[in-house]
Amino acid sequence: MSNNTTKVNNPMKVITGKDTRWSYTNVWEAKSITGGAPKFSVSLIIPKSDTVTVQKIKAAIEAAYHEGEAKLKGNGKFVPALSVIKNPLRDGDTERPDDPAYAECYFVNANSTTAPGIVDADRNPILVRSEVYSGVYGRASINFYAFNSNGNRGIACGLNNLQKIRDGEPLGGKASAESAVSYTHLRAHETA
């Protein structure tokens, strides 16, 4: 008796490389942005040197475009070209030239109405919220899909799961505990 398990390959799903950096991490509680439905979200900063992940994302966007042609067409007579609709893969050098975290990188904003699974490098669930912050590195399981909402058309990125691989310098101006302690220690000696 054979145990034939066929893995279904979803061309619109991508698992990023381990050098993807997480920013604007909002993965513990859903938040509403501009009055919309509350969502979990993260900005994934992908080095341009990670050509494997970048190519997978481009292929998934293309697959989502073809899968969603009817949705993108809507009531119109034609499907708009992929080059003229909203694209989730964005160039950090062009869109965030003053932010060193985005230099030589692409970025994708991923979100979901359901909480992502979050695990460590050994695939154990992360339960301590402070372990996941803007600046950590890890893999992200994401999927791409077409949308057409009130004439606003494009490809969006859904957030499935996250795997933290390693810590990184916190982004967003939050000081590390080490630097805060050192500063306090120095200030105490200055006033003594």
Predicted regions located by residue number:
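OB-fold ssDNA-binding interfaces and closely related basic DNA-contact patches used
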Residues: 1-107
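Short acidic, low-complexity segments enriched in Ser/Thr/Gly/Pro
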Residues: 97-126
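Short acidic, Gly/Pro-enriched loop/turn segments at secondary-structure junctions
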Residues: 168-178
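Residue-level recognition of well-ordered beta-strand positions that form the cores
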Residues: 43-45, 109-111, 141-143, 163
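Conserved small/polar residues in nucleotide/adenosyl-binding loops
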Residues: 184-191
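A short, structural micro-pattern
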Residues: 36-38, 100-102, 136, 151-156
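OB-fold/S1-family single-stranded nucleic acid-binding modules
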Residues: 151-167
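Exposed beta-sheet edge/beta-hairpin loop segments within beta-rich domains
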Residues: 122-138, 145-155
